[in-house]
């Protein structure tokens, strides 16, 4: 077996003790924050009524259910958008605090989101593939371990972004996503 290394700030270090399982030779282990832009949401001050409106959906953990997002519960004005965190369609939202930790969904539009949600906007990888990894027992368990055993588990963006994920070649990502769709379609017929 070959060893696994990462190079950060010009320093190479062995990460064998972090590798949870073997992956095919043409796959790589990668930190979540290396495959896209990560951010944590925020809530514009409600004392500024001009921030509220109907221009852009404002998402909270309660709006994420079973991999879907309810977009019409709250919204911000154009001015509110300027003080909020914004992500584009194809970004993956994941609740990172409390009993809902790990709930996630892919947005199909530009949105703003609150501080209980971390987002990754994938670059050069398939969003649906990364979403599938983030829903896996491996990833959810890793999140909860990093969140600690407090009464209210929480994982900050730095720890969340440092979680390792297995990344396959892009063509394989699309094949995996398509196969997963086929299987889920068959399951819904049962």
Q: Which positions does each model-derived feature cover?
A:
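Short, ligand-facing micro-motifs at secondary-structure edges
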Residues: 43-47, 64-75, 89-113, 128-132, ...
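Glutamine-centric residue-chemistry signal
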Residues: 39, 94, 115-116, 140, ...
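Non-catalytic DNA-recognition/assembly elements of restriction-modification systems
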Residues: 13-42, 166-178, 182-190
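Sequence-specific dsDNA recognition surfaces
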Residues: 12-18, 33-48, 62-89
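Extended, domain-scale alpha-helical bundle/helix-rich regions
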Residues: 1-11
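A short glycine-rich beta-alpha junction/loop motif
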Residues: 111-118, 128, 149-167
């Amino acid at each position: 077996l070959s060893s696994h290394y990462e190079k950060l700030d010009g320093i190479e270090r062995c990460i064998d003790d972090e590798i949870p399982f073997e992956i095919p030779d043409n796959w790589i282990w990668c930190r979540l924050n290396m495959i896209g832009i990560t951010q944590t949401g925020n809530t514009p001050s409600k004392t500024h009524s001009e921030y509220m409106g109907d221009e852009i959906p404002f998402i909270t953990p309660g709006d994420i259910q079973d991999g879907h997002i309810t977009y019409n519960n709250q919204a911000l004005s154009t001015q509110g958008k300027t003080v909020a965190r914004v992500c584009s369609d194809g970004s993956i939202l994941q609740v990172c605090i409390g009993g809902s930790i790990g709930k996630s969904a892919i947005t199909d539009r530009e949105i703003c989101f609150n501080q209980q949600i971390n987002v990754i906007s994938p670059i050069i990888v398939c969003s649906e593939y990364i979403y599938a990894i983030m829903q896996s027992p491996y990833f959810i368990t890793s999140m909860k371990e990093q969140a600690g055993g407090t009464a209210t588990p929480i994982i900050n963006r730095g720890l969340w972004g440092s979680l390792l994920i297995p990344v396959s070649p892009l063509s394989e990502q699309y094949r995996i996503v398509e196969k997963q769709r086929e299987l889920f379609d068959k399951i819904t017929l049962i």
